[in-house]
Amino acid sequence: MKNKHKAIAAAGIAAAAAGVIGYRVEAARRARADADTLRQAYESLNGQERLTDPGNYFQAVALPADIQVRLLTAQQAANMSEGTVFFGFPTCPWCRNALPLALEAAAGAGCTLCYCPLDEYRDVYALEDDALVEKTPAGPGYHALLARLGDCLEPYTLTDSRGNAVPIGEKRIFAPTIARFHNGALTNFWTLEAIGFQLPEGQSKYAPWSGERRGMVRETFQKMF
């Protein structure tokens, strides 16, 4: 009987160990897949002309092979209780400059950076003959995300043909934005505007940032992480 009990206990321990190993293997697989997806999204545009802005080309970026990143949906980001989320998209020239620095800072702090592809969820409005038209509806979870980020966000407005501001009636998540959550609370909210970032006069937003401006942004990221 004792041997039988020992055998059952051993089998239970083995099953639990196998479950833990399986979970870790699957987590590692997902992490690699997320890193590959993000890297492909950004690097596939290297040197390409932006079709919606002819004459301007996406700068080449190279994301490290060993980046620690987790892709989130808008709803997952809205439900975040612990971690740091980068909101951006590959065709955003500001994101192409900022994301490598954010990944670098996260790696230096031993953290995994979460990434939410903002262009897949953010709604888009336009003015046609000064009439407000919804061009792209909000994706699942986007309005929950607006509610979660709350007072940190600026109103979403457009400008009509007479130069008047036209409010959309909701807030706007601009790219890039970084939000840090701790113990269920939003503890840090980062945008380029908030840190006083400006390009030198005449520099294209598509161009790589100077060492001075990279250093400025890197320092804010290091403090955040």
Give each language-model segment a name.
Residues 80-83, 109-114, 182:
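Loop/turn elements at helix/coil->beta-strand transitions in domains of secreted/extracellular proteins
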Residues 78-92, 102:
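Short active-site neighborhood of thiol/selenol oxidoreductases, capturing the structured segment around
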Residues 95-109:
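Typically the conserved alpha-helix immediately C-terminal to a functionally engaged Cys/Sec
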Residues 7, 12-80, 200-225:
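N-terminal leader/targeting and pre-domain segments
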